Design a protein with these regions (language model features):
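C-terminal recognition in membrane/secretory proteostasis and scaffolding
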Residues: 1-58, 63-75, 79-128
Length: 128
């Protein structure tokens, strides 16, 4: 039996000033990493370090207006973040209650940040 898989991805070439080269690792794919990619790019083009030296993990799709969308598998992604000693886990608004439930259920020592828009997440990270 032969099985063939295909993945379709919409590519966009966006010109920025300053220029940003962004390389994706082979094991990184899917819409659920969109928010973290956007935050990483923001961190590269500004002088303010959003991480403040901490490990920040998270998930969430993002549209071209900066609105963060829900994802699947929050409990697994949160558990992975805790395992990697992340201090912060960013999660879409639609998944926020589930993340809080999992944090309490497993007594995770991690800050959960609710993500509705890219702008608001940036402001929350700056304020922490």
């Amino acid at each position: 039996r032969i099985v063939i898989g295909a993945s379709l991805t919409e590519l966009k070439n966006i010109k920025t000033d300053p220029k940003v080269d962004y390389i994706f690792k082979d094991n990184e794919s899917g819409a659920s990493r969109g928010l973290l990619c956007a935050l990483d790019i923001y961190n590269k083009i500004t002088k303010f370090d959003l991480t403040k030296g901490d490990i920040i993990s998270g998930t969430g799709s993002i549209d071209d207006k900066g609105v963060v969308g829900s994802i699947d598998g929050v409990k697994y992604k949160l558990a992975g973040a805790v395992k990697r000693h992340a201090k912060v886990f960013i999660v879409p608004t639609d998944n926020y209650k589930e993340a809080l439930y999992e944090k309490e259920k497993h007594n995770y020592d991690i800050e959960i940040i609710e993500a509705d828009t890219l702008h608001n997440v940036i402001e929350k990270l700056k304020a922490r």
